[in-house]
Amino acid sequence: MKNILIVGAGFSGAVLARELADRGGWKIRVIDSRDHIGGNCHTEREKSTGVMVHKYGPHIFHTDREDVWEYVQRFGEFRPFINRVKASIKKGVFGLPVNLHTINQFFGKNLSPQEAKEFLKTVGDDGIQEPANFEEQALKFLGRDLYEAFFEGYTLKQWGCSPTELPASILKRLPVRFNYNDSYYNSRHQGMPVDGYTAVIESIFDHPKISVELGTEWNETMKKGHDHVFFTGPIDQFFGYSEGRLAYRTVFWERKEAEGDYQGNAVINYPEKDVPYTRVHEHKHFAPWEEHEKTVVFTEFSKETEEGDIPYYPKRLAVDMKLYESYREQAQKASGVSFLGRLATYRYMDMHQVIGEAMDFSTKVLEAEGGGQDWPLFSGE
């Protein structure tokens, strides 16, 4: 029987732990530096309002993978939830992503889907042949009015740099729907866990061969006594930031309680430059089957990650990817350790991607062990 150490008690660590314990019969020790499980997906019910709060920002579960959808439902009840994001600007409140209703409302028109496609061609900048950055990509396909209303200021606030400094690949495809579908996601399955994400992860960890230790920092001496370490934290942290820190954006919130209904929607974006925050979350709307007299609202701000901050969004600019490659080279020389999850592989990942990748990674580990081969070094490869 293998003795395994997993660093990190979020979805990556939890799913890997469960799969290796269930299918491999291995003994799993999980540690996390925080005082709770769940990582940034952590949810808790507030005493003062009774509302289930997403402590590190809103998380809406959505996936097209049937096996992932079935997997999470093994560990908790999910109810249907469609995230309908609004954008508040001086001109009014509009639906996001930009859809047919947004276009007609914004331009004061009554266009059909085909007419809207033709209309956007007339307002888009056809002088841009090969977009070199985010701004040019948006101007080419959306035109200046929609770009400035919904994308320019929000991007500047979220990423802390000009949209001209960001790669065009961020807008890989036209971010417009030529219908009245105002669901933020297109995924087949969308839902919210009735008892919160932390309860789901707690259920995943509920196995006789899994132990979880909170408030426990990782250090190299912990390798002793374990056959292998799976690290789900920041890869630059694992190597002591020896090459420098990978760049992330982080977020912070101003919390406010109110009576009744504060904004009438779970998430409202504020894309204009002169508004310092990016969006406002009203958490009771993430559980519309519940009723609460009070409400709790979080106003979200974005900033560059500094020492001690929780990393959220990897910037992944050219200089960052070069730095990440240097850490990957160090990882190739390390022994007895593998890396998985968004922080360890320096990627932005949604929950369903994290879970699916951990499921796939566990299969690769077990198959490698069964075949007498080297275990995989990185997830997602």
Positions of predicted regions on the chain:
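N-terminal Rossmann-like FAD-binding beta1-loop-alpha1 element of flavoenzymes
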Residues: 2-30
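Short aromatic-enriched loop/helix-cap "lid" or pocket-rim segments at secondary-structure transitions
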Residues: 41-44, 98-100, 226, 293, ...
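Glycine-rich FAD pyrophosphate-binding loop
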Residues: 21-47
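Generic structural signal for residues in well-ordered beta-strands
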Residues: 28, 210-214, 337
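Mid-domain catalytic core of redox enzymes
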Residues: 23, 216-330
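Conserved flavin/dinucleotide-binding core of flavoenzymes
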Residues: 45, 281-381
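Active-site/ligand-binding neighborhood in enzyme catalytic cores
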Residues: 90-94, 100-228, 239
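Dinucleotide-binding Rossmann-like beta1-alpha1 core, especially the glycine-rich loop
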Residues: 49-123
